[in-house]
């Protein structure tokens, strides 16, 4: 049993290497610096990143361990011939958190699948504090949840590789519904920070579902998302902004070049219903960007709910012990309400 006092070294010994590598994926393989000292505990990690709640990380990890003990949970998104042609695609994975609750398959029972993308400034994928705890809660509420590890920044421009990875993951799930025991008839995408940008792009026809000839997600569920690339990076000092823009889009880019990837500038009435949670005290991504996005969705007559707790910061993931706590269940309720279904959660006996 993992606790807040469990060390990184102990977690590594509990998890198989291929699962441990999914906790915080980056090209350095050091958990974006969090795992360089393996004597650190989850409580130590929270002390360094206060928004990363140790109890939430414990909840996600213990759920992952239980799932792994029951069977396979880690899947390659791309085929071997695709990874041979592009080795970076070998790092694109899905971690499955199967639904832990079930309806009784009554007339109005609908199975749903949620695909989550963690944040990390497109330089890492921070599943440990974000997608894994959220997926564990969604699974406890009857949602099959899969956490996507997508390609992150390197020397070459990154975009649109993450968008390709999300589309490939959705296609993989449609092709493997029976093998994974999931249903993609009703699916949604969600994400956190940069992963929120990725999920939000999935709802744009030109960047997401229509471009890749996929059914549209029924909902987009976002936590403190990066919605406008230029505005989000504009607050950074010039050298850092240039460095990140180069990593995302290549050298010599400017505001106009970011346009296709600015979610708030590319929505229309066909955008999926959207739930957003964003703390007002977020000092990394301005909450006002989410507010402006919500206003744009309302203008386009797209169903939208935005929650703006006063406190929570950036990176709260599931939101345990913050004013955002419970947002996962509220987001799932919102998703269900778009299809006018009875909202109920029934735990398996």
Can you say where each PLM-predicted feature lies in the sequence?
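Alpha/beta-hydrolase superfamily serine-hydrolase fold, recognizing
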Residues: 1-349
């Amino acid at each position: 049993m993992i606790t807040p006092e469990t060390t990184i070294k102990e977690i590594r010994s509990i998890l198989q290497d291929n699962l441990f590598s999914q906790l915080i994926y980056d090209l350095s393989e050091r958990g974006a610096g969090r795992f360089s000292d393996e004597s650190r505990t989850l409580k130590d990690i929270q002390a360094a990143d206060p928004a990363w709640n140790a109890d939430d990380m414990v909840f996600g990890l213990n759920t992952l361990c239980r799932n792994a003990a029951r069977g396979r949970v880690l899947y390659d998104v791309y085929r071997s011939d695709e990874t041979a042609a592009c080795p970076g695609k070998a790092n694109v994975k899905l971690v499955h958190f199967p639904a832990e609750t079930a309806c009784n398959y009554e007339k109005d029972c609908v199975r749903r699948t949620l695909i989550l993308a963690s944040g990390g400034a497109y330089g890492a994928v921070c599943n440990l504090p974000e997608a894994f705890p959220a997926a564990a809660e969604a699974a406890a509420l009857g949602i099959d949840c899969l956490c996507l590890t997508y390609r992150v920044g390197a020397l070459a421009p990154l975009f649109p590789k993450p968008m390709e990875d999300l589309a490939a993951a959705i296609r993989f799930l449609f092709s493997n519904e029976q093998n994974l025991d999931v249903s993609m008839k009703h699916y949604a995408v969600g994400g956190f920070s940069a992963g929120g940008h990725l999920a939000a792009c999935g709802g744009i026809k030109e960047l997401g579902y229509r471009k890749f000839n996929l059914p549209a997600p029924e909902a987009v569920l976002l936590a403190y998302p990066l919605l406008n690339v230029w505005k989000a990076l504009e607050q950074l000092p010039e050298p850092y902004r240039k460095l990140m823009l180069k990593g995302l889009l290549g050298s010599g880019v400017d505001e106009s070049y970011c346009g296709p990837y600015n979610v708030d500038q590319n929505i229309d009435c066909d955008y999926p219903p959207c739930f957003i949670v964003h703390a007002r005290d977020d000092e990394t991504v301005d909450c006002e960007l989410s507010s402006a996005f919500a206003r744009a969705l309302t203008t386009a007559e797209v169903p939208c709910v935005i929650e703006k707790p006063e406190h929570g910061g950036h990176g709260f993931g599931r939101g345990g012990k913050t004013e955002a706590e419970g947002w996962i269940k509220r987001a799932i309720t919102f998703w269900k309400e778009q299809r006018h279904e009875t909202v109920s959660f029934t735990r398996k006996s």
